[in-house]
Amino acid sequence: SPANYATAIQIRERAQQEIDQLSDAQYAYLLEQLIDQHLPIRFDMQLASDYLQMSERHLRRSLLLEGISFQQIRQTVLERKAKQMLKNNLSIGDISQALGFSEVREFRRAFKRWTGQAPSVYKNGTE
């Protein structure tokens, strides 16, 4: 109906205004939340820009102004989740799968790159 259409347009415009008012720091925070909520899906820059209804270029520039990249945000989320899961005694295989890694080996390599130690060493150090 025309009334529903008008309401939908108003909601869309209001959402766009809120997105436009976000500061760069809020973009980073929002991206952290989106990446976390969509695990184990690999929430990439294209999905993020589609979700935020902006171009990848605009999102990339907004993050650049803050001095952070999408990849850094994604890595921060994955590292934080991995550490949390290791502390909760989840298996490395389960963690790897929950974070969207295709292989355990890939997760182990990423974790070592992030922290400087293997997941098993980190897990034993937190017990």
Cite the ranges covered by each PLM segment.
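Extended mid-to-C-terminal alpha-helical interaction segments
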Residues: S1-E127
